[in-house]
């Protein structure tokens, strides 16, 4: 096992005030969901979860169809159900959103699409990105730059990408009527200013609202355990943990890198429940890491805050950033993120 102190990281800046203003508004639907939440008992974190597995629905689709979702950093949001949303209206939505972005730029608002504003908005379905047949189809929204040459029919580079999905979202699907489409997890790669403008259009069009989805240290520990438990044909990355040490005048970060086979051996030594991960096993796994680190460096990691986890399956940061690396476990990663998103909006 290898360990080292990482240089201080610059804290992520808060989202723009425009982004904040949009993502905290309460819609009539949110008020109804809040009413339902108050009438139901609090549901604690499940004491056990299944180890992520491959999805048959995903296997039935050409892997190249969603390969572009991998190895990119996505910012996470939770999303309340969309009112009167229709998959058959994608062409109309593309035109309306394109016009809305053009109008916002004409107002002088910050839109990061280039000076010539020669863009195209595209809505499309992401087949296979779901946990069960009952889950709504995932869909993708992209802002593309148009080619400047009339003879060129190829699309230009992707300026902004966002996708909406629901993976094993039964708990939310059971609480809303047929007028609503439940896609509680929204993932974005692109400028925050564009995210705010596109989010505003969705809010006005579908009576929904977005909220940044942070990942606390407790959930990062679960991710570390579940992803370490996954069987890999070959490991693509070192298993790494990053802890933040609050101190004055500046914070200190501690990075702890472990060979993935060593991490898997450690997990196997504490894992007793076939096919599942339990809270007790997660705690034991993390306690073993803390003990090993303290034995070598005399530092109590339990007094710090876990802020990032990286494995060959995926990496996640407490500020709501995720990067999915292994296509086999794409659905498994999204299932847990959907669970967190549903919990945030219920």
Swiss-Prot record:
It comes from the Eukaryota. The modification Phosphoserine is found at residues 41, 55. Keywords: Centromere, Chromosome, Nucleus, Phosphoprotein. GO terms for cellular component: inner kinetochore; nucleus. Component of the CENPA-CAD (nucleosome distal) complex, a complex recruited to centromeres which is involved in assembly of kinetochore proteins, mitotic progression and chromosome segregation. May be involved in incorporation of newly synthesized CENPA into centromeres via its interaction with the CENPA-NAC complex. Component of the CENPA-CAD complex, composed of CENPI, CENPK, CENPL, CENPO, CENPP, CENPQ, CENPR and CENPS. The CENPA-CAD complex interacts with the CENPA-NAC complex, at least composed of CENPA, CENPC, CENPH, CENPM, CENPN, CENPT and CENPU. This is Centromere protein L. It comes from Bos taurus. The gene is CENPL.
């Amino acid at each position: 096992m290898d360990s080292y102190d990482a240089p201080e990281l610059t804290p992520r800046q808060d989202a723009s005030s425009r982004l904040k203003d949009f993502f905290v508004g309460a819609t009539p639907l949110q008020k109804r969901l809040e009413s339902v939440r108050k009438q139901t008992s609090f549901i604690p974190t499940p004491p056990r979860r299944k180890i992520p597995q491959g999805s048959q629905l995903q296997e039935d689709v050409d892997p190249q169809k969603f390969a572009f979702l991998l190895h990119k950093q996505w910012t996470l949001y939770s999303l309340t159900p969309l009112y009167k949303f229709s998959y058959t209206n994608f062409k109309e939505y593309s035109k309306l959103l394109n016009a809305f972005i053009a109008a916002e730029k004409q107002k002088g608002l910050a839109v990061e699409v280039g000076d010539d504003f020669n863009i195209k908005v595209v809505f499309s379905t992401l087949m296979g990105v779901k946990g069960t047949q009952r889950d709504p189809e995932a869909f993708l929204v992209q802002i593309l730059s148009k080619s400047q040459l009339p003879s060129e029919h190829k699309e230009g580079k992707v300026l902004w990408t966002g996708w909406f999905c629901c993976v094993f979202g039964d708990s939310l699907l059971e609480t809303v009527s047929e007028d609503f489409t439940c896609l509680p997890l929204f993932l974005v790669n692109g400028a925050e200013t564009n995210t705010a403008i596109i989010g505003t259009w969705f809010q006005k069009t579908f009576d929904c609202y977005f909220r940044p989805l942070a990942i606390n240290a407790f959930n990062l520990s679960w991710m570390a355990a579940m992803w370490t438990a996954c069987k890999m044909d070959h490991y693509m990355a070192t298993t790494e943990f990053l802890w933040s040490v609050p101190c004055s005048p500046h914070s200190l970060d501690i990075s702890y890198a472990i060979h993935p086979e060593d991490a898997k051996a450690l997990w196997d030594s504490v894992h007793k429940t076939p096919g599942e991960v339990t809270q007790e096993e997660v705690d034991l796994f993390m306690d073993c890491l803390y003990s090993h680190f303290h034995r070598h460096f005399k530092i109590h990691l339990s007094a710090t805050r876990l802020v990032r986890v990286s494995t060959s399956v995926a990496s996640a940061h407490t500020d709501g950033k995720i990067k999915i690396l292994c296509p086999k476990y794409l659905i498994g990663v999204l299932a847990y993120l959907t669970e967190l998103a549903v919990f945030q909006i219920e």
